Amino acid sequence: MTAPTVPTAPNVDREVLREAIQEEYEAVAREPDRGFHFHTGRPLAEILGYQAEWLDGLPEGSIESFAGTGNPFSLGVLGLEERVVDIGCGAGIDSLIAAGMVGPEGAVIGIDMTPSMLEKAQAGAGNLEHVEFLLGFGEELPVPDAWADVVISNGVVNLMPDKHEAFTEMARVLKPGGRIQIGDILVDRPVPENEKEKIELWTG
Protein backbone atom coordinates (compact mmCIF):
# COMPACT_ATOMS: atom_id res chain seq x y z
CA MET A 1 0.00 0.00 0.00
CA THR A 2 1.41 3.37 -0.99
CA ALA A 3 1.84 5.89 1.82
CA PRO A 4 -0.17 9.10 1.41
CA THR A 5 1.70 12.07 0.02
CA VAL A 6 2.42 14.78 2.57
CA PRO A 7 1.70 18.19 1.05
CA THR A 8 4.59 20.62 0.91
CA ALA A 9 4.19 23.66 3.16
CA PRO A 10 4.16 27.03 1.37
CA ASN A 11 7.43 28.93 1.20
CA VAL A 12 6.40 31.69 3.59
CA ASP A 13 8.46 33.15 6.44
CA ARG A 14 6.72 31.70 9.49
CA GLU A 15 8.05 34.29 11.94
CA VAL A 16 7.04 37.21 9.73
CA LEU A 17 3.61 35.65 9.26
CA ARG A 18 3.16 35.12 13.00
CA GLU A 19 4.12 38.73 13.70
CA ALA A 20 1.58 39.97 11.15
CA ILE A 21 -1.17 37.78 12.60
CA GLN A 22 -0.34 38.86 16.15
CA GLU A 23 -0.50 42.52 15.15
CA GLU A 24 -3.92 42.01 13.56
CA TYR A 25 -5.42 40.20 16.53
CA GLU A 26 -3.82 42.46 19.13
CA ALA A 27 -5.94 45.17 17.49
CA VAL A 28 -9.07 43.01 17.68
CA ALA A 29 -8.40 42.48 21.39
CA ARG A 30 -7.63 46.11 22.24
CA GLU A 31 -9.99 47.90 19.84
CA PRO A 32 -12.84 45.49 19.05
CA ASP A 33 -15.12 48.26 17.80
CA ARG A 34 -12.58 49.71 15.37
CA GLY A 35 -13.93 47.86 12.35
CA PHE A 36 -12.03 45.15 10.48
CA HIS A 37 -12.20 43.43 7.11
CA PHE A 38 -13.88 40.49 8.90
CA HIS A 39 -16.90 40.34 11.19
CA THR A 40 -16.47 40.23 14.97
CA GLY A 41 -18.40 40.04 18.22
CA ARG A 42 -21.83 38.74 19.12
CA PRO A 43 -23.40 39.50 15.72
CA LEU A 44 -20.82 37.18 14.14
CA ALA A 45 -21.39 34.47 16.75
CA GLU A 46 -25.13 34.57 16.08
CA ILE A 47 -24.58 34.34 12.32
CA LEU A 48 -22.44 31.26 12.93
CA GLY A 49 -25.17 29.55 14.93
CA TYR A 50 -24.03 30.09 18.51
CA GLN A 51 -27.00 29.65 20.82
CA ALA A 52 -28.15 32.61 22.90
CA GLU A 53 -27.95 30.48 26.05
CA TRP A 54 -24.23 29.93 25.42
CA LEU A 55 -23.52 33.62 24.87
CA ASP A 56 -25.72 35.19 27.54
CA GLY A 57 -23.57 33.97 30.40
CA LEU A 58 -20.24 35.01 28.91
CA PRO A 59 -18.29 38.18 29.74
CA GLU A 60 -18.70 40.98 27.21
CA GLY A 61 -14.91 41.27 26.93
CA SER A 62 -14.69 37.77 25.49
CA ILE A 63 -17.65 38.19 23.16
CA GLU A 64 -16.65 41.58 21.71
CA SER A 65 -13.29 40.26 20.45
CA PHE A 66 -14.67 37.05 18.96
CA ALA A 67 -13.39 36.62 15.40
CA GLY A 68 -14.15 33.01 14.50
CA THR A 69 -15.04 31.68 11.08
CA GLY A 70 -17.26 28.78 12.09
CA ASN A 71 -18.87 26.98 15.01
CA PRO A 72 -17.01 23.91 16.29
CA PHE A 73 -19.98 23.00 18.49
CA SER A 74 -22.16 22.51 15.41
CA LEU A 75 -20.29 19.20 15.10
CA GLY A 76 -21.56 18.10 18.49
CA VAL A 77 -21.77 19.24 22.09
CA LEU A 78 -19.01 18.19 24.45
CA GLY A 79 -19.56 15.64 27.17
CA LEU A 80 -19.31 16.02 30.92
CA GLU A 81 -15.82 15.46 32.34
CA GLU A 82 -14.14 15.63 28.94
CA ARG A 83 -10.75 17.27 28.45
CA VAL A 84 -10.60 19.89 25.71
CA VAL A 85 -7.80 21.75 23.91
CA ASP A 86 -8.84 24.96 22.14
CA ILE A 87 -6.23 25.93 19.53
CA GLY A 88 -6.17 29.66 18.84
CA CYS A 89 -8.60 30.41 21.67
CA GLY A 90 -8.49 34.17 21.20
CA ALA A 91 -10.49 36.01 23.86
CA GLY A 92 -11.83 32.70 25.10
CA ILE A 93 -15.43 32.44 23.91
CA ASP A 94 -15.13 28.81 22.70
CA SER A 95 -13.06 27.76 25.71
CA LEU A 96 -15.64 29.20 28.10
CA ILE A 97 -18.53 27.56 26.26
CA ALA A 98 -16.58 24.29 26.35
CA ALA A 99 -15.98 24.73 30.09
CA GLY A 100 -19.72 24.97 30.63
CA MET A 101 -20.32 21.81 28.64
CA VAL A 102 -17.67 19.64 30.31
CA GLY A 103 -18.44 20.88 33.82
CA PRO A 104 -16.07 21.29 36.77
CA GLU A 105 -14.87 17.69 36.55
CA GLY A 106 -13.67 18.31 32.99
CA ALA A 107 -10.80 20.52 31.88
CA VAL A 108 -10.14 23.04 29.13
CA ILE A 109 -6.80 24.38 27.92
CA GLY A 110 -6.99 27.39 25.61
CA ILE A 111 -3.87 28.23 23.62
CA ASP A 112 -3.16 31.43 21.71
CA MET A 113 -0.11 33.32 20.48
CA THR A 114 -1.55 36.81 21.04
CA PRO A 115 -0.94 38.12 24.58
CA SER A 116 -3.79 40.66 24.60
CA MET A 117 -6.27 37.98 23.59
CA LEU A 118 -5.03 35.73 26.39
CA GLU A 119 -5.45 38.56 28.89
CA LYS A 120 -9.09 38.90 27.90
CA ALA A 121 -9.59 35.14 28.03
CA GLN A 122 -8.08 34.88 31.51
CA ALA A 123 -10.18 37.79 32.74
CA GLY A 124 -13.28 36.16 31.30
CA ALA A 125 -12.57 32.86 33.05
CA GLY A 126 -12.64 34.57 36.44
CA ASN A 127 -12.46 31.98 39.20
CA LEU A 128 -13.11 28.93 37.02
CA GLU A 129 -10.57 26.35 38.13
CA HIS A 130 -11.02 23.92 35.23
CA VAL A 131 -10.00 26.40 32.51
CA GLU A 132 -6.40 27.34 31.76
CA PHE A 133 -5.03 29.70 29.11
CA LEU A 134 -1.49 29.32 27.78
CA LEU A 135 0.71 31.23 25.36
CA GLY A 136 1.69 28.97 22.48
CA PHE A 137 1.39 27.97 18.83
CA GLY A 138 -0.81 25.43 17.11
CA GLU A 139 2.22 23.70 15.65
CA GLU A 140 3.88 23.41 19.09
CA LEU A 141 1.12 22.79 21.61
CA PRO A 142 2.13 23.07 25.29
CA VAL A 143 0.01 20.02 26.12
CA PRO A 144 1.07 16.48 27.12
CA ASP A 145 0.67 13.54 24.77
CA ALA A 146 -2.76 11.85 24.78
CA TRP A 147 -4.24 14.39 27.20
CA ALA A 148 -7.38 15.54 25.36
CA ASP A 149 -10.68 13.92 24.47
CA VAL A 150 -11.46 16.73 22.03
CA VAL A 151 -9.50 19.35 20.10
CA ILE A 152 -11.47 22.38 18.98
CA SER A 153 -10.35 25.27 16.80
CA ASN A 154 -12.07 28.18 15.10
CA GLY A 155 -10.61 30.18 12.23
CA VAL A 156 -7.01 29.31 13.01
CA VAL A 157 -5.87 26.36 10.90
CA ASN A 158 -6.17 28.49 7.76
CA LEU A 159 -3.49 30.78 9.24
CA MET A 160 -0.97 27.96 9.70
CA PRO A 161 1.23 27.42 6.63
CA ASP A 162 2.09 23.79 7.47
CA LYS A 163 -1.27 22.04 7.84
CA HIS A 164 0.33 18.60 8.15
CA GLU A 165 2.35 19.79 11.13
CA ALA A 166 -0.75 21.32 12.71
CA PHE A 167 -2.83 18.15 12.42
CA THR A 168 0.09 16.00 13.59
CA GLU A 169 0.14 18.05 16.81
CA MET A 170 -3.59 17.63 17.24
CA ALA A 171 -3.19 13.87 16.89
CA ARG A 172 -0.37 13.89 19.44
CA VAL A 173 -2.39 15.56 22.19
CA LEU A 174 -5.54 13.49 21.57
CA LYS A 175 -6.31 10.29 23.42
CA PRO A 176 -6.91 7.21 21.26
CA GLY A 177 -10.37 7.63 19.78
CA GLY A 178 -10.36 11.37 20.47
CA ARG A 179 -12.02 13.77 18.08
CA ILE A 180 -11.40 17.05 16.29
CA GLN A 181 -14.11 19.72 15.92
CA ILE A 182 -13.01 22.62 13.72
CA GLY A 183 -14.72 25.64 12.23
CA ASP A 184 -12.61 27.25 9.51
CA ILE A 185 -12.48 28.59 5.97
CA LEU A 186 -11.31 26.86 2.80
CA VAL A 187 -10.47 27.93 -0.73
CA ASP A 188 -12.31 26.11 -3.50
CA ARG A 189 -9.64 26.49 -6.17
CA PRO A 190 -5.86 26.03 -6.38
CA VAL A 191 -3.76 28.93 -5.12
CA PRO A 192 -0.66 29.75 -7.22
CA GLU A 193 2.58 29.05 -5.37
CA ASN A 194 3.79 32.66 -5.66
CA GLU A 195 0.53 33.88 -4.09
CA LYS A 196 1.06 31.62 -1.07
CA GLU A 197 4.20 33.59 -0.23
CA LYS A 198 2.35 36.90 0.19
CA ILE A 199 1.87 37.69 3.88
CA GLU A 200 -0.97 40.13 3.18
CA LEU A 201 -3.05 37.35 1.63
CA TRP A 202 -2.64 35.17 4.72
CA THR A 203 -3.79 37.92 7.08
CA GLY A 204 -6.38 39.50 4.76
Where are these regions (language model features)?
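A short His-aromatic
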Residues: M101, N158-L159
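Hydrophobic beta-strand segment of the Class I
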Residues: V84, V151-I152
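Conserved alpha-helix/loop element of class I SAM-dependent methyltransferases that forms part
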Residues: F38-R83, D94-M101
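Class I SAM-dependent methyltransferase SAM/SAH-binding core
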Residues: T69-P72, G79-L141
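A short glycine-rich, Lys/Arg-flanked "PGG" loop and its adjoining helix->strand segment in the class I
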Residues: H164-R179
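Short conserved loop adjoining the S-adenosyl-L-methionine
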Residues: E140-D145, P161
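Short, glycine-/aromatic-enriched active-site segment of Class I SAM-dependent methyltransferases
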Residues: I185-G204
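N-terminal auxiliary segments of SAM/dcSAM-dependent transferases
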Residues: T2-L48
